[in-house]
C-alpha cells in the first residue's frame, strides 16, 4: 500500500472535509528549498512548509545544532523549570532589542503565540483594575487556527464555519 493510500486511511489534513479529501502528494524528504516525493519529483517549497522552515530542509548546520541539543536535552516544560539554551538565547536577544524588551515568553507555534499575547493583554489591564474589553487587530491578517487567532485574523473561508464562536475584534486598516 502506498504512502498516499495509508495516509488517506488514517490522517485528517488541515482545511479538508474528510469525505471530499483528495490524494496527497507523498513527500519522503526535503533538500534545501525542495520537497521530494516517493517517485523523486521535486517541488519548490515556496511557503517554507507553512512559514516554519525558512532555512530550508535538512540544513547541515541546523541539523548539527539540533543533534547537539537533543543529546543534552530534548525538551523540558517551562512551568517551573529552565535550561541553558533558553536562558542564553533570551540574554542574547536583550543585546539587540530595545531596552524595554528584556523578558521573553516562549510558545510552541504561531497560533499559540497569538493566544498568549491576547491573554497577556487581557491580564495586564485586569491587573491594573482597568476594564478594557476590546481587541484591535489589523485588517487582512492571518494569525493562526485557534479560535482567538481566527478572531484576530481576517474573516475567510477558513474561519467562516466558526463565526458564531469567535470573539469580537475591531479591525483597523493596515497603515500605508
List each language-model region with its residue ranges.
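Active-site-adjacent loop/helix segments that line or gate small-molecule/cofactor pockets in enzymes
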Residues: 1-31, 48
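Glycine-rich loop-to-alpha-helix module at the N-terminal edge of alpha/beta enzyme cores
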Residues: 15-16, 42-130, 136
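Short secondary-structure boundary/capping segments
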Residues: 25, 127, 160-163
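A generic fold-level signal
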Residues: 28-30, 130, 164
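Short, acidic, Ser/Thr-enriched surface-loop or helix-capping motifs
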Residues: 37-38
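PLP-dependent aminotransferase-class I/II
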Residues: 140-176
